[in-house]
Amino acid sequence: MSKIQLSPMQQKVVNCWGKGQSVVAGAGSGKTTTLVLKCFELLNKNPDSRFAAVSFTEKSASDLKEKLCAKLDLNGKGGALSGHWVMTIHGLCAAIIKENAQIAGLDGEESVLSESEAKLLWEQAVDRLWFEQLPQSVEQNLQYLLDRESRVSLLGLLQRVKSLTTFGVLDALTESEGKDSKALLALSQYVLRHYENSKKRRGVLDFDDLERYAKVVMQDKKVQKRYQKHFDLVLVDEFQDTNPVQAEIIWKFVRPDQSNLCVVGDPKQSIYRFRDADVNVFQKLCDQLPEKQLLNWNFRSRPGIIDYTNQVCEKVFEPSEVEYQPLIPKREPDENLDPVLRLDLNNPEELGVWIKKQVQENSVPLHDMVVLLRRVRGNEKWLKALSASGIPIAVGSGGLFWEDPRVREITCFLRWWSNSQHVLSGASFLRAPWVGISDDTIDQWIKEDPQLKSLFLQSDHPIAQSLSQFKDDPYVDPGKLLLSLLVNDEIESEIGFALLGLWHRVEELSTKGLDFHSVVRELTLAMEESRRERDVPPPRNLGQLTVLTMHGSKGLEFPHVILVDLAGKTRAANAPLLFWDRNKGTYLAKRDENGDRVKKDDHEAQWRSYEKEKSLDEAKRLFY
């Protein structure tokens, strides 16, 4: 292995043995190199040692595995990883369950559902509420809630309860007072019970099951001792993205003296609150470990960028729950380059002029630049202006664009809207997980209206309500129609980036003079041929300007980054009907006699303020 020069702080991390260690690793601090070398040092000290390296995204786990295999020559020592574990947190849970199926109460042959498969089973369980004879108590609770909520709103409440079940929301609802909460609890328990039974009959597990059963297994003292003895190093990357259940599972791998634990993370980069990731989990664990290290030398960005980041973020982070640790630039400055520019633009078109100038006068390749958007909704003006300027842009969901199921579902929507007789396309759109119309409902609608569209538009589904404004417009702009699908933050999170890529293609075709039907025909042909359009990232499209959301850009690097639309205020996420916090419990928002949310509810006002504060804190971390 070639010799790598480490910073003094990196060397401390590599050389720390025999006591629990927490590492706060700032952006661009050489974290992955440090972790690989720590594993190398472990095997150098004792070739028979074993390590478990856990990360929280497929991308980071794959990158870590690739670098470990290359640097440590693991492939040449009796297997792909020679007994070491390098995997995501859900991969870790699956491995635990597979090795200890009997303790988990399973047979060990269970398969793991994809998100779409789990969504389908859940919808089938929910459909029992509408199409089967219900126990009297369940029927009463259902009718009570339907008097208060629309069907779509109730489905959203049930989905939210399901997503929070692992974290104790049912217990919190049990302790809540009020008939509304009790009715929601009873209905949720009924649907969840049938969902669980459906999975058991099929021999399948979802991601929540992986965490739940792994937690059960790791309660066994013998299992704990076996793993604690087996793994001489438990290395946890991206720990700022963990939730309490995942943290508890990992902690069971740790020896009583904590000598085999090294957790790495950066609370300033915790941006997965919607998955119940909690930055406080990382901070509390760090407080329990005796050895604390800080990696804040930045080897990635120019000094001017680091200075600007420190100047802005030190002030921004002052009132937040995360302490800001300034980065120290280690790259050589370029005296001929101003690394940070502020562009005061009168309109988006001026951005296109500026980018062209960078290409023509400063020889900056387009593929070295990226435009970052805070969100998709409301920012299409930037893309329209860039396209109108003749700048080729590359946006999409990454990978093979037309193989993304969300792209296919949205294309089916356009095909159906173009011609209502394309019922199969309409059904494909309606049953998409982010739309969520059940097969039984679709079948019922087809019996009443073979073309489906009119009944869907008459429903109280939020997408239907958004689309209804276009139902009598034969000349509707397809790009505008696409953007109307982004009715809330949840749907934007699910399909926003895929829709952005498709929207860009629609705009390109429209500027060529193609009408709605011709645009749809071109898109359908591309989808049916599965044209292998590779979007960025990766790989980058030569000669094209990349457009990403801030959230989608995490973990990527570009020589030139353009942040747009930062002058506007950060919007808090839409206030949920069911508020949740693992410490505060739950609160179900009240309704008045007309079914509207009570405007003057002091209790809900406190929850809204709390949600706004948390959303603002995460927006700061996303900006960093």
Please provide the spans of the model-predicted regions.
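ATP-hydrolysis module of ASCE/P-loop NTPase motor domains
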Residues: S55, G78-G83, Q102-L184, K292-R300, ...
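Helix-hairpin-helix
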Residues: L430-K447
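C-terminal accessory regions
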Residues: W434, N541-L545, H551, N594-Y624
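P-loop NTPase Walker
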Residues: M1-D107, K179-D180, N197-S198, R202-D208, ...
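Conserved helicase/translocase P-loop NTPase motor core
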Residues: V86, H90-C93, L184-L233, V245-I249, ...
